[in-house]
């Protein structure tokens, strides 16, 4: 199999806002901007899906069983294809350094969204023990206006991170239950463990995109003879599973990845360096918007909808945050009711029960002076929690240009650049609200637009109860077509991937 961290940022996307929008009717312009914003949330999740399906769903049972005999150093190149159209390439190099290994992984990728081709580049360096356990790494992503760099080192039972985003470096420390792997370290370890049909392995994997460690599994399905070029080769078919997602790959006995297939039609094919980097072979791309929408019965005037009842099918829904607050979930049916605005309280929130939702994170830098100063300027001394939350919502809506950006959003970067989609709106709002003393969490799910449901993100604020709002749409509170599936940061939001391509929604009633 072949592992590439770069896929987790496959879809960093920028669309320049044209002055022709001013010639549109106000409602038509807003409809187009909203559709761009909800599309971009889905693209981030697509990047997570492909990264998980290809590159994190490989696994290891017995770390102690790995020996370095048979490890092959050198380079491996692949072309990346979308429905038979070449969209990029990936390159991995394994190097022996004394009693350890250095693994380099780089990828470049194009994606067509709404007629615009966007380019993403990632580079990962991983330094491991002789058994391919992670010692330290650095990860860089660059695309358009967005860039991020993460460095990490295993220190005892902690993974210590330096995260550079928005011009600021923050330190984070993550407790480890066991020594972790990066995705690109897995194949050498898997080869050493043995490719025997019927075997199943587990790997604890650290994902720089979500900054957490989770397990994945891989099973060796069959041993086959296939034709590769002008000759036959023995290959092993592997089924990779992560959180319900599956991908299939074929690798040779000595570890060459011949082919990989993901659930969304992305394919990696083994190529020479010259072939992999032949960018002139890229033909017309498939516009990703064709994969976004969840068809549904029509909802007239969704922004004014205060009650919605819908049937959700096609995928197991255990473990999602579908029940609670403004949602009632029974069987396969969810009801959403927009709450009346409560009286709220005086800022800052003084309870200790929601401290975690007032704290900064690596990407929600609510303790940074620039965030605090901006919140103070917006609120102008207003201490009423409801009014403050509403003012922040209106300011973020007005301040952030609706120029879609697929990235790993950072509040400081959004504050500086003032462009983005629903992820950027939600991240900046969350940072501003927390800095003002309003407990705030991020939600992800689906929202209805003119022709169906799209994946989307929005904040929820604590005003005596959790109130869903939407700074992307300037809704306070958010309309009832916002169906929440998860709450939490990016690591939790990526559970949405279980729904992609499977979820079906039937609107039963709305008003």
Predicted segments — roles?
Residues 27-156, 163-167, 172-175, 186-350, ...:
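Acidic, serine/threonine-rich low-complexity disordered tracts
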Residues 183, 342, 348-420, 489-494, ...:
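Secondary-structure boundary elements
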Residues 189, 200, 409-414, 449:
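Acidic/histidine-enriched alpha-helical segments
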Residues 84, 389-397, 429, 433:
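Conserved hydrophobic/aromatic pocket- or pore-lining residues that grip, position, or stack substrates
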Residues 55-61, 229-237, 243-245, 249-250, ...:
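Hydrophobic/aromatic-rich core segments of domains that either
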Residues 2-4, 18:
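Position-driven detector of the extreme protein N-terminus
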Residues 16, 20-26:
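Short, positively charged and aromatic/hydrophobic N-terminal segments
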Residues 5-8, 14:
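Short hydrophobic targeting helices and cationic amphipathic motifs
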């Amino acid at each position: 199999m072949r592992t590439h961290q770069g896929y987790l940022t496959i879809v960093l996307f920028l669309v320049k806002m044209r002055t022709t929008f001013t010639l549109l009717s106000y409602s038509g312009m807003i409809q187009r901007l909203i559709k761009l914003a909800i599309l971009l949330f889905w693209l981030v999740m697509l990047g997570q899906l492909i990264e998980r399906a290809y590159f994190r769903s490989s696994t290891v049972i017995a770390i102690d069983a790995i020996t370095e005999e048979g490890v092959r150093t050198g380079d491996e190149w692949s072309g990346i294809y979308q429905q038979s159209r070449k969209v990029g390439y990936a390159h991995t190099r394994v190097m022996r350094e004394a009693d350890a290994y250095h693994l380099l992984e780089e990828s470049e990728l194009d994606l067509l969204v709404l007629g615009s081709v966007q380019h993403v580049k990632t580079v990962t360096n991983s330094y491991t023990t002789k058994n391919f356990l992670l010692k330290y790494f650095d990860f860089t992503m660059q695309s358009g206006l967005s860039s991020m760099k993460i460095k990490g080192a295993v220190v005892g039972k902690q993974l210590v991170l330096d995260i550079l985003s928005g011009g600021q470096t923050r330190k984070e420390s993550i407790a480890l239950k066991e020594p972790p792997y990066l995705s690109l370290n897995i194949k050498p370890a898997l080869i050493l463990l043995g490719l025997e049909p019927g075997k199943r392995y587990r790997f604890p994997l650290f994902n720089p995109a979500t900054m957490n460690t989770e397990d994945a599994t891989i099973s060796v399905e069959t041993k086959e003879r296939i034709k590769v070029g002008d000759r036959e080769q023995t290959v092993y078919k592997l089924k990779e599973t992560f959180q319900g997602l599956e991908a299939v790959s074929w690798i040779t006995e000595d570890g060459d990845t011949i082919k990989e297939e993901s659930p969304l039609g992305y394919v990696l094919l083994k190529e020479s360096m010259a072939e992999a980097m032949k960018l002139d072979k890229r033909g017309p791309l498939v516009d990703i918007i064709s994969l976004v929408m969840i068809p549904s019965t029509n909802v007239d005037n969704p922004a004014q909808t205060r009650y919605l009842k819908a049937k959700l099918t096609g995928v197991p829904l255990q473990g999602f945050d579908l029940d609670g607050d403004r949602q009632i979930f029974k069987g396969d049916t969810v009801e959403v009711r927009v709450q009346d605005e409560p009286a709220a309280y005086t800022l800052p929130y003084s309870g200790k029960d929601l401290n975690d939702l007032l704290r900064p994170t690596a990407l929600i830098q609510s303790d940074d002076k620039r965030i605090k100063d901006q919140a103070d300027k917006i609120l102008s001394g207003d201490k009423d929690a409801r009014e403050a939350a509403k003012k922040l919502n209106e300011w973020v809506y007005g301040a952030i240009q609706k120029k879609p950006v697929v990235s790993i959003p950072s509040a400081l970067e959004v504050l500086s650049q003032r462009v983005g989609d629903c992820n950027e709106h939600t991240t900046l709002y969350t940072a501003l609200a927390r800095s003002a003393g309003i407990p705030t969490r991020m939600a992800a799910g689906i929202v209805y637009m003119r022709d169906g449901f799209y994946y989307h993100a929005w904040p929820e604020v604590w005003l005596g109860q959790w109130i869903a709002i939407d700074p992307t749409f300037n809704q306070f509170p958010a309309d009832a077509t916002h169906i929440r599936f998860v709450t939490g940061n990016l690591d939790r939001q990526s559970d949405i991937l279980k729904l992609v391509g499977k979820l079906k929604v039937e609107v039963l009633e709305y008003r």
